[in-house]
Design a protein with these regions (language model features):
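N-terminal signal-anchor transmembrane alpha helix
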Residues: 13-43
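Interfacial helix-loop-helix junctions of multi-pass membrane proteins
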Residues: 60-77, 117-143
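Extracytosolic (periplasmic/ER-lumenal) interhelical loops and adjacent juxtamembrane/interface segments
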Residues: 37-75
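A short, surface-exposed beta-strand/turn
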Residues: 262-289
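Short, non-transmembrane alpha-helical segments in secretory-pathway proteins
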Residues: 184-246
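Small-polar-interrupted transmembrane alpha-helices in polytopic inner-membrane proteins
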Residues: 21-28, 103-125
Length: 289
């Protein structure tokens, strides 16, 4: 009985640790599009670290990501849905006794993967390109059902205890490392305002909008997107043509163009696009349309 109680305490601690990690991660993902545009070096650094650290997590394609604050998120809409589902499941587990028992069933957890798989497979094999709404919805559903089932099987209804505080304390070194890394990265990163000034020094005749392109999207994902031809977007087209070792930590693109039309992410009208290395501020490429 004592060993069983110890095992239960360990699982409860793991639950709280995962819950806090997912909460911090999701919070950063949502705020990153705003932070990356900040002139404050620390806030900019936090946003930059979020984009850079997710190169192994996601393809980071802007055309498959949600837009917040005029900027695309560090991970795609499907991944955002998955993590949001995990977060909601953790919250819901505190009230599991009041929720329908069907949510705890193993078959629902298994079936929840089907919509996610169908949505991804039909796109992978080129039948059609799924929408951000379907990506987010299927990710949210699968993330919630699987996580809610796992919590109820291995942990049960969680309770606030000393393990809650212990999990928070374990998280503090991670937050300290994140802050320290953000200060370091932010001190060398070019701000959106700096890039706008650089672009205006070249072209001051047209309104200029500045966007951030995540590292993996710039280096490989955009040019490998088989649905790129379906977009009337000059920026995406330009990125697919750039062959440069720069941009390993992300790229700023200054778009100087008129009215856009058709299906696009950044811009599709006549004008000029200026690509800058986000770390050095070096002008990587310039295209006129």
């Amino acid at each position: 009985l004592k060993r069983k109680m110890q095992s239960s305490h360990v699982l409860e601690f793991i639950f709280y640790l995962c819950f806090f990690l997912v909460s911090v991660y999701l919070f950063l993902i949502i705020l990153s599009p705003l932070l990356i545009q900040s002139d404050n070096r620390i806030l900019l650094g936090i946003g930059a670290v979020s984009y850079i650290s997710n190169v192994l997590m996601c393809h980071q394609l802007p055309e498959r990501s949600l837009e917040l604050f005029g900027q695309y998120m560090p991970i795609c809409s499907r991944d955002v849905g998955l993590f949001a589902g995990v977060f909601v499941a953790c919250i819901a587990s505190f009230a599991s006794d009041k929720l329908p028992k069907v949510l705890k069933s193993s078959w629902l957890a298994i079936l929840s993967v089907v919509p996610l798989g169908v949505d991804g497979v039909v796109q992978l094999f080129g039948f059609w390109e799924s929408t951000n709404a379907s990506r987010f919805a299927t990710g949210l559903f699968a993330g919630f059902c699987i996580s809610y089932y796992a919590v109820n099987v291995f942990v049960g209804p969680p309770r606030l205890s000393k393990r809650t505080l212990t999990a928070l304390l374990v998280l503090l070194p991670f937050l300290a490392i994140l802050l320290g890394t953000s200060v370091y990265v932010g001190s060398g990163y070019r701000t959106k305002s700096e890039i706008l000034s650089k672009a205006k020094a070249i072209n001051n005749d047209t309104d200029i909008k500045v966007f951030y392109i995540a590292p993996r999207a710039f280096s490989s994902s955009i040019r490998n997107d088989e649905y790129l031809r379906d977009y009337n977007d000059t920026v995406l087209s330009d990125v697919s043509r750039i062959r440069s070792s720069s941009g390993a930590y992300g790229v700023w693109v200054a778009v100087a163009s008129g009215d856009s039309n058709g299906r696009y992410i950044f811009a599709s009208g006549n004008g000029s696009n200026y690509f800058y290395d986000a770390m050095s501020g070096e002008l990587i490429a310039e295209f006129k349309h």
